[in-house]
C-alpha cells in the first residue's frame, strides 16, 4: 500500500521545496533506526534514498542508529559535513533532531512521524497508515464471534493514536 510512499515524498520535497543550482552541490543525509535490509520501515526509506541518488543528488546514510545520544551525534556529524537536507527516520529522533537543528539554521531537517517543529528548518512527515488500519478494523469487526476486537499498540505517539482511533 505504501510501497512508493517514500519515493513520492522525497520527489515532492525536491520538486516543490528546494531550488539548487546543481544537484552535485546538494547533499542529503539519512539517519536510519534499523538496517537497510529489514524489508520494512528502513528499507522503504532506503529505496527513496536510492531514487534520489539515481537522480544525481549526492546522498549519505547511517543505519542502525540507536535513539538518544547516538542519534544526536550522527545527526550533528551529517550537519557538520555539509549536508543540506537530513532525514531523521524514527520517532525517537525527534528531540535530537530539534536540538541539532537549532545549531544549524541553514540545514533543513525532515523528521518522521514526530510532532515537534521547534525551529523553522524542521519539518515532519508521515504516511496515512490509519487508512489501512480502518479497513482492517472493519474486517476484524465483521469476523469476530464475540463482538470484541483488540489493538496492540507500542507507544502513545501521534502515529499510534491515529491508528487506534481509525
Which residues are covered by each model-predicted region?
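Bacterial N-terminal signal peptides that target proteins for export
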Residues: 1-10
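N-terminal signal peptide c-region/cleavage motif recognized by signal peptidases
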Residues: 17-21
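Extracytoplasmic "Venus flytrap"
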Residues: 29-52, 60-71, 91, 157-161
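An alpha-beta-alpha
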Residues: 49, 135-166
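Short, well-structured alpha-helical segments in soluble
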Residues: 68-82
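Periplasmic-binding protein-like
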Residues: 83-90, 110-112
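Flexible loop/hinge segments that line or gate small-molecule binding clefts
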Residues: 102-127
Amino acid at each position: 500500500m505504501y510501497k512508493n510512499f517514500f519515493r513520492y515524498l522525497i520527489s515532492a520535497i525536491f520538486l516543490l521545496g528546494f531550488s539548487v543550482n546543481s544537484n552535485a552541490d546538494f547533499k542529503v543525509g539519512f539517519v536510519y533506526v534499523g538496517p537497510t535490509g529489514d524489508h520494512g520501515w528502513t528499507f522503504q526509506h532506503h529505496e527513496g534514498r536510492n531514487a534520489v541518488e539515481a537522480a544525481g543528488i549526492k546522498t549519505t546514510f547511517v543505519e542502525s542508529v540507536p535513539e538518544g545520544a547516538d542519534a544526536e551525534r550522527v545527526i550533528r556529524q551529517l550537519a557538520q559535513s555539509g549536508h543540506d537536507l537530513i532525514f531523521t527516520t524514527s520517532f525517537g529522533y525527534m528531540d535530537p533532531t530539534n536540538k541539532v537543528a537549532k545549531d544549524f539554521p541553514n540545514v533543513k531537517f525532515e523528521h518522521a512521524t514526530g510532532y515537534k517543529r521547534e525551529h523553522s528548518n524542521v519539518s515532519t512527515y508521515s504516511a496515512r497508515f490509519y487508512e489501512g488500519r480502518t479497513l482492517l478494523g472493519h474486517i476484524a469487526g465483521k469476523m469476530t464471534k464475540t463482538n470484541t476486537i483488540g489493538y496492540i499498540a507500542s507507544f502513545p505517539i501521534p502515529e499510534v493514536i491515529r491508528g487506534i482511533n481509525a
